[in-house]
Amino acid sequence: MILVTGGTGLVGSHLLYQICQSETKVRAIKRLQSNTEFVRQVFSYYTEKADALFQKIEWVDADLLNISELDFAFKGATKVYHCAAWISFNPKHKTKMMYTNIEGTTNVVNLCLAHHIQKLCHVSSVAAIGNTINSAPIDEKTPWVNSPINSCYALSKHRSEMEVWRGIHEGLNAVIICPAIIMGPGKWEKGSSMIFKQVWKGFSFYASGTNGFVDVRDVANVMIQPVSYTHLTLPTILLV
């Protein structure tokens, strides 16, 4: 059985659609107050059989910071996708975001080891690579450089990655996916998908600088491959 954390998020919902097309059993973790209707809506973007596919998901309420709840969700799982994370660039969220992202990943890694999970796919971010000198190109081998201009979010994702690497050194079979800014059909009123709504309304401004973008559907498709074929040993994959 496949277990997905962050199933009601942008990446998690599109990933669930990909998984539900197979005969594999799938369980998704959500917070108690999360609304799964968004996932059904995402499914409807793909197919008229959205309801039938949506019914294949076993939903479990669990907090990533609650070990007992998380341990229950892991029972019977063989492969895990860790998509859940708090995304914020507001300095006032730093302490809670750092704790949530890092400790949540620590718990996932520890339970993957305890439950002998065959493969973990951890969704990180290009932000986890940090800023390079003179905006030099980056790849999967670019080392992290401590810098005061690294965002709190970037630091939280970098340290979360360190927990996954710790798990790898302890014998966990894992892959880390590092997408750029993820775009695609989702919650039009929040997150990166807001840009579509703003442009539709006639937003006529743009910022200087450069960035990378990737379609959420491509992210979901790429995530399936290294988990389906557990013998693949690419520890980190950048998606831009």
Enumerate the language-model features and the residues they cover.
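Substrate-positioning beta->alpha
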Residues: 159, 190-191, 207-226
